[in-house]
Amino acid sequence: MAEQQLGVLKALDVAKTQLYHFTAIVIAGMGFFTDAYDLFCVSLVTKLLGRIYYFNPESAKPGSLPPHVAAAVNGVALCGTLSGQLFFGWLGDKLGRKKVYGLTLIMMILCSVASGLSFGNEAKGVMTTLCFFRFWLGFGIGGDYPLSATIMSEYANKKTRGAFIAAVFAMQGVGILAGGFVALAVSSIFDKKFPAPTYAVNRALSTPPQVDYIWRIIVMFGALPAALTYYWRMKMPETARYTALVAKNIKQATADMSKVLQTDIELEERVEDDVKDPRQNYGLFSKEFLRRHGLHLLGTTSTWFLLDIAFYSQNLFQKDIFSAIGWIPKAATMNATHEVFRIARAQTLIALCSTVPGYWFTVAFIDTIGRFKIQLNGFFMMTVFMFAIAFPYNHWIKPENRIGFVVMYSLTFFFANFGPNATTFIVPAEIFPARLRSTCHGISAAAGKAGAIIGAFGFLYAAQNQDKAKVDAGYPPGIGVKNSLIVLGVLNFIGMLFTFLVPEPKGKSLEELSGEAEVSHDEK
């Protein structure tokens, strides 16, 4: 049976790149577009939420979210994502990739819309319902990580597998960029329709009641691309590797792949479903798994964990860093819509110049340079640029040096995406056995989200000024932006060291990497 299985799958490994591969990239990629849009668009509207729901007419500064509310709004979706990665990763191996794949998209669509419809008679009610729906939004997003990566890896040929998985993940960059463009468009329209004075001129009128629609429209827009691809996602057949290696139905796998690849794949009549090699039936918590893949799983979880502390803290709190260096004007000198526009413009510029190009550089070079070198170099360059920003921080905050700061800051994002942010997603979908692939990817991704939660909650407090008089309302003094950036640089360096635990999958079949090809070799 092993030879038949590998014979069927060899057709996938050597298949020429064709239309169906690109169709799969678009179908899976649109899920990731929505993932990134929904996770990161909240950073564009948190200051607006503070102005609307926590306005204090006696304060010289516009309203801001209290520390616990800001932490919840920024972090609750990440908590949901972590849970979803573990649950749907496990379910994808138990029930099959296709059966679970549509469910994650439905959750993302419904909860995106529901988040924008958050309600309540007072601020607490609105924030509570928003956090509730964003948790379940994150739960659906979490399922998309292991399923999209696993499906794309199992459909791809071995020559361009890395580029295909990276292309799916690169849609995350497009989603981040789209969030910025949507926020720019919506805030511009509302500014023309409902002009308002700055906060310094008139505190109450600086936030017209109509701006409450701005954040709701921005949040709900993420449901649109996901809804457009739902039909096509449900039409995708189960992956041949799951059908053959896990469900043990070679005949069905062959039929599915013949349709997908538009070619005839020969199948011998001898199908011995009852033949099982005990060496290939070890479980996740077995000694055999520990021996074969224990260090690999440690490598994928640790590097993703360390990377996401830095990546998410930087992404979610760009607005705070830009405000600290003076690239975004002081809040009191703007009205509510102007502030959304300025934050969106800054984040869009970073995404356009560094985040998005980084993703596509990975797509272009991953199957020539290899995953290991890209990840190692990415962590190294992130460390270098983070320290280059942090140690002379007082130099960068001078008005004449702000452009230099933005360039250096952009380069850390470029090498995150042409580096570990992409490779930590790709490698776990390649190196584990088919029956545990989705589960192990989910575990690796969940470790990453644990890091993201630390980044989201920790950086919020850590980046506060060391001077009590300069901290944001409700926060204790922190270690400051400079020291926070130094900590992130150290974490990037540690991530570089843990990269040595991760194998290089370039040019190898999934069965070679997972050890599932060993039975065939032994039988010969």
UniProtKB/Swiss-Prot annotation:
For this record, the Gene Ontology CC terms, alphabetical, are:
chloroplast; membrane
Domain of life of the organism in this record?
Eukaryota
TM region(s), chain numbering? 25-45, 71-91, 100-120, 132-152, 162-182, 212-232, 293-313, 349-369, 372-392, 403-423, 442-462, 485-505
Q: Which GO terms describe its biological process?
A: cellular response to phosphate starvation; phosphate ion transport
| Residue ranges annotated as Extracellular topological domain | 46-70, 121-131, 183-211, 314-348, 393-402, 463-484
According to its UniProt record, what is one Pfam family this protein matches? Sugar_tr
| Topology Cytoplasmic: residue spans | 1-24, 92-99, 153-161, 233-292, 370-371, 424-441, 506-524
User: Which keywords does this Swiss-Prot/TrEMBL entry list?
Assistant: Membrane, Phosphate transport, Symport, Transmembrane, Transmembrane helix, Transport
InterPro entries membership = MFS_dom, MFS_sugar_transport-like, MFS_trans_sf, Phos_permease
Please report the record's description of how this protein sits within the membrane. Multi-pass membrane protein
Note the PANTHER family from the entry.
SOLUTE CARRIER FAMILY 22 MEMBER
Could you share any additional remarks the record makes about this protein? Although related to the sugar transporter family, it does not transport sugars.
Q: What does this protein do?
A: High-affinity transporter for external inorganic phosphate.
Q: Which family does it belong to?
A: Belongs to the major facilitator superfamily. Phosphate:H(+) symporter (TC 2.A.1.9) family.
Q: What is this protein called?
A: Probable inorganic phosphate transporter 1-2
Gene from which this protein is expressed: PHT1-2
